[in-house]
Amino acid sequence: GLYADKLAHDYGFGKRYTLIPFKGLYLKYTKNKTDVKMNIYPVPNLKNPFLGVHYTETVDGDIKIGPTAIPAFWRENYDMSHGFSLTEFGEVIFYEAKLFLANSFNFRGLALEEMQKYNKDYFVSLAEKMVVSIDPKGFTDWTKPGIRAQLLDKEKLSLVQDFVIEGDQ
């Protein structure tokens, strides 16, 4: 979760890791629920840990596209004020700036690409590539965002692709 690293640190584990939050935005398709009846994923880019924009059918039958993987500025950055912490903001910005300047794992390109997804037309164009019969005007409403808790190895300046298991004897 969003505070797993802090919890681990409190118990003396995972000191070389910190969490970098990424915001996932979604757009709801409001035109016709039958236009897409299953989850549809793009071929993943193995150079980054994110799936890319994909179609999801929700439990109530709605269709949404997303998520983005936009670097968030604090752990609970669901909107511009929710859960704001100046200390957290400083920590997150420090590591995001470090990743951006060092361009570790092409973070700069990834961040700039993801920021483009704030543009609704661009965001929808990515989904259109997978389902050409979809009406782009049907994507009307932004839904509640999610925050991905992404672990960062502070020593290697790399994202951790899997779990880290540490413990005492």
Task: Indicate residue ranges for each PLM-predicted region.
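Flavin-dependent oxidoreductases
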Residues: 1-86
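Short, functional N-terminal and low-complexity linear motifs
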Residues: 6, 89-96, 157-162
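Residues that form generic nucleotide/phosphate-binding pockets
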Residues: 10, 92, 126-130
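Flavin (FAD/FMN) cofactor-binding core of flavoprotein oxidoreductases
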Residues: 16-24, 28-32, 101-169
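Dinucleotide-binding/catalytic capping subdomain of oxidoreductase cores
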Residues: 63, 67-122
